[in-house]
Amino acid sequence: MESWSERTKQLLGSENMEKLARSRVAVFGVGGVGGYVVEALARCGVGFLDLTDADVVAPSNINRQILATVSTIGRPKVEAARDRVRDINPDCRVKIHKIFYLPETADHFDFREYDYVVDAIDTVSGKLMLAEQAKAAGTPIISSMGAGNKLDPTAFRVADIYETKVCPLAKVMRRELRRRGIEALKVVYSEEEPLKRGRTPGSVSFVPSVAGLIVAGEVVKDLLGREATRLSSELSLCRMESNI
């Protein structure tokens, strides 16, 4: 019987799988985008996950959040995420923080402990502080921009924050990061014009999920090195062709 990670190993190779197993990734926010980041990282074999979110699962989350089901309503999202990761990859060590990342809670975290930081939170102040703290620690970070009020999952792009366009959240982030002297920030953003502007953004299942999977893909490729993942994939394809 194949191991659960065998198909991934065929693409990435044993050495890269071992590197992922040693990697520690912090995910801030495990909702619509962040939940899918956690899902994909766990299924790729990342060995250490630090998950931060103070929210509990609500019925309104079910339309788009992978952790939200009828059976998880009322549960802290990070607890639901931890249990799901353990069901996927029992070897993954998961640490949870049932708090929001805010100025008053920032001292709970030492960013030097992480190999990568994922920002999937909603507040501009939190996103800015995450960028500042990760940059100060020299830890790679990727930030998710707005995924609400959108219907086109093919409109997502990966870019530096200063190369973004259309996204209202990215516009605010550009201005505030420039004020803080932060010269670069890798982001996933959408070039789709928001469909509506309201107090509560509309959402659909197939948009934040795609954003989260793109974020996770960038994390894995950066952890392993772009060239390493390309060469491993090419080698795997050659082996498959030789067996035909």
Which positions does each model-derived feature cover?
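Conserved S-adenosyl-L-methionine
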Residues: 43-48, 136
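Hydrophobic/small residue at the entry helix of a nucleotide-binding pocket
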Residues: 33-34
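Conserved N-terminal Rossmann-fold NAD(P)-binding element of oxidoreductases
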Residues: 27-29, 52
